[in-house]
Amino acid sequence: MTKVLYITGHPNDETVSNSMAAGKSFIESYKQSNPDHEVVHIDLYDTFIPLIDKEVFDGWGKLQSGKGFEALSETEQQKVARLNELSDEFAAADKYIFVTPMWNLSFPAVVKAYIDAVAVAGKAFKYTAEGAVGLLTDKKALLIQSRGGIYSEGPAADFELGNRYLQTILGFFGVPSVEELVIEGHNQMPEKAEEIKADGVRRAEALGKTF
């Protein structure tokens, strides 16, 4: 069975967020077109994503030195186990849908925390004599992003770092197909805000039927 991770990185719902509105439209359309696929929603604002901190490094260090899992402190066990769950889930999935806003030219910190959690050697990529090689070569991804300004073209295009980072890291993981659906300009052109949102929702619904 095809497994899809629907990963949302916005604290607001579709009534407030353009990216979440488009994401909801996409995933509902996708489910209707693919009723036999398993869709798992990962709300990054409502799930435990451990930061890679000293306790995590200490826990990993104990395991690498040959100590058993029981040698880790309770907090180390919780964090290390959760990171293993997240990275295993990511590696086992077939498709990834990232729904994010553009904040300060990038994305919310919870998105980077999630990427750090799943970017595990031996699962997402491996090291070879020639360098790192991605392992997720049979996957597919979609990036749904909303931007208040226009960053797809023009003088601000080089300032967009969120989707560019996700494109790069997913490519590093070996993902061969990464598509984008962008909703932009609603703050720059407030008189067209509703039209921009509605267009994004329509495009998302259409893409859900073919992705």
Curated annotation (Swiss-Prot):
Name by which UniProt lists this protein: FMN-dependent NADH:quinone oxidoreductase
One MF annotation (Gene Ontology) recorded for this entry: electron transfer activity
Cofactor note: Binds 1 FMN per subunit.
InterPro entries reported in the protein's UniProt record: Flavodoxin_fold, Flavoprotein-like_sf, FMN-dep_NADH:Q_OxRdtase_AzoR1, NADH:quinone_OxRdtase_FMN_depd
Cofactor: FMN
Subunit structure: Homodimer.
Protein role: Quinone reductase that provides resistance to thiol-specific stress caused by electrophilic quinones.
Reactions catalysed: 2 a quinone + NADH + H(+) = 2 a 1,4-benzosemiquinone + NAD(+); N,N-dimethyl-1,4-phenylenediamine + anthranilate + 2 NAD(+) = 2-(4-dimethylaminophenyl)diazenylbenzoate + 2 NADH + 2 H(+)
Enzyme class per UniProt: oxidoreductase
Annotated residues for binding of FMN: 17-19, 102-105, 146-149
Keywords in alphabetical order: Flavoprotein, FMN, NAD, Oxidoreductase
Domain of life of the native organism: Bacteria
SUPFAM superfamilies to which the protein is assigned, alphabetical: Flavoproteins (SSF52218)
Gene name of the encoded protein: azoR
Keyword set includes Cytoplasm: no
Pfam families assigned: Flavodoxin_2
Family: Belongs to the azoreductase type 1 family.
EC number, UniProt record: 1.6.5.-, 1.7.1.17
